[in-house]
């Protein structure tokens, strides 16, 4: 399932990653994870600069949403070196729970795209407002410090969180910025 900027109309090959959620029925064995990761590393070479970001989750946690959400495997460019230097360790340890998945599932549920498999509404339940809000709140917790390193990213992210908090809007960062500009224009007039 494709989510993120690629489905929200604001993909930028120089700034965006490709966000994917892969849904499986059963637990994935480490040998299969290793084979899969070897393919992912090769595919990542053809991806945009920020690469691929993907998580493998079990269907059961999508239908009966669990928060924080368990995952079978996760990959992003941030973890590439770990996998390349110690693939067995990576495959054995890259499993757990991730609060960020609530945000990803929400984007999929409302705006995602099926690349292969069942219809979104057959696989994913709607994430509760509380879980989604906590997920996006966790994403901005360090904003006061992070804004010095990535001001545009943080400001746009803050705008989209506020758009959800105030109006229940599921927005991309770009849309969050546009929403905020509209709010500021309203206040100015």
Residue ranges and their predicted role:
Residues 4-42, 51-58:
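Catalytic metal-binding acidic patch
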Residues 143-149, 165-168, 186-188:
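Terminal low-complexity, intrinsically disordered regions
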Residues 33, 38-148, 155:
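Conserved NTP/Mg2+-binding pocket subregion across the NTase superfamily
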Residues 10, 188-189:
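Short, compositionally biased low-complexity segments
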Residues 169-188:
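Short, charged amphipathic alpha-helical segments flanked by flexible coils
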Residues 24-28, 146, 162-164:
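A generic structural motif
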């Amino acid at each position: 399932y494709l989510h993120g900027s690629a489905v929200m109309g604001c993909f930028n090959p120089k700034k965006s990653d490709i966000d994917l959620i892969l849904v499986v029925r059963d637990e994935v064995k480490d040998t299969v994870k290793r084979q899969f990761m070897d393919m992912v590393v090769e595919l990542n070479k053809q991806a945009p600069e920020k690469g691929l970001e993907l998580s493998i989750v079990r269907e059961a946690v999508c239908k009966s949403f669990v928060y924080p959400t368990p995952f079978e495997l996760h990959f992003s460019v941030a973890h590439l070196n770990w996998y390349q230097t110690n693939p067995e360790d990576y495959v054995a340890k890259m499993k757990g729970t991730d609060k960020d998945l609530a945000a990803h599932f929400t984007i999929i549920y409302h705006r995602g795209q099926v690349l292969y498999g069942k219809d979104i509404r057959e696989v994913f339940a709607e994430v509760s407002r509380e879980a989604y809000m906590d997920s996006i709140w966790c994403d901005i917790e360090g904003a006061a410090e992070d804004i010095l390193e990535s001001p545009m990213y943080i400001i746009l992210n803050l705008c989209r969180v506020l758009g959800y908090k105030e109006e229940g809007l599921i927005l991309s960062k770009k849309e969050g910025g546009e929403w905020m500009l509209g709010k500021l224009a309203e206040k100015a007039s």
